[in-house]
Amino acid sequence: MNKKMILSVVMAVILTAIAIPSSPAMAGGKELVIADFDAGDKPNNIGGDFGAWDKDPGDGTQGTKMSFASDDALGNPLGHSIRLDYDVDSSNPAYNGFWMKLNGEDAGEFNALTFYIKGDAAKGFSKRVKIELKDQGSKTSAYMLGNITEAWRKISIPFEKFNRITDWSALSEFVVVFDDLHSMPKNGAVLIDQIAFSKE
């Protein structure tokens, strides 16, 4: 093989490496994206449904409304996140939020739940929200997330923090909870994107 041909092969390899960069999601380990919301529609990336939930749908003084926002955590101009407008300012006990089906997903090879979150500075937002995971037996384990800011922030919660779940081979649901004890202010909005299981 002459020098000109060798040089051509080397250049082709270099150009291919530049054109196809390694995925940032895979750079530090393994990741399964559950929901990137980029379609701006249901279902999530693993075929699961999702939406807002209310403790008492008949109580108009409280509730969460879910919508798609064209504010992507990774800066994708065509991407989306979900926006959760919550209200727990009620004379009645109030809690509500967001649910997402995980369809029995096996998370055994992963060790952390990751996602991006930020608050809406214009409307106001709680600096704390409760994050729950449920297994197939509907056993719920919760983690109180704090330090939410008005800028996108990547959250990584080790599975060990969800200490009531002992079997990670079949998970049923991811839940966000706003409540009248921890959500201050009692009405506001947060955005969430790129929900995933990761091995870190």
What is each PLM-predicted segment?
Residues M1-V10:
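Bacterial N-terminal signal peptides that target proteins for export
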Residues S23-E200:
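Beta-rich carbohydrate-recognition modules and glycan-binding surfaces
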Residues T16-P24:
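C-terminal segment of classical bacterial N-terminal signal peptides
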